[in-house]
């Protein structure tokens, strides 16, 4: 399978956010958008594929797969790739919210929960509010900047995760389960991925069927 299909399969192998009400076809289509964005960001930071051109500056020291799996890891732990977060419709308690003059304001945007800092331009930040391919690709590329900065500072995957999470040390305790998740998905065989995707598909379809039954019983 090509790399975008590979990323899509990894994404589909993960538990969906409980709030997501997509059917399998809808979820697959959205995961394909995320996978395409991750593919672009991973290629750009490693100067591979269409970015393998004179003048490209490699910002990630590892290969394309390593940064792609790290983007999946961060996206899952930051938002579980929830549909409402992807679309920019965070609930009052999500996306690093606070209240000002009776208004709920969300500081973090996109599946990677990116806040406005010096690593993000105003234009980029303003565009990270939808589930379009363009918006998702911008967010994935910005997320890479944070991860690359952490890797440059700490020289380890755990360090990159730690710095991304706001820690000022390279061995933040909260990074351990995230690193374990990263190690698990990057080492999955094609057979393991396919089996996990099939399991998630069956669980999702059964859940949706159960919800329909309950809804009909309440009528």
Where are the model-predicted features located?
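Catalytic glycan-binding domains that act on GlcNAc-containing polysaccharides
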Residues: 3, 11-219
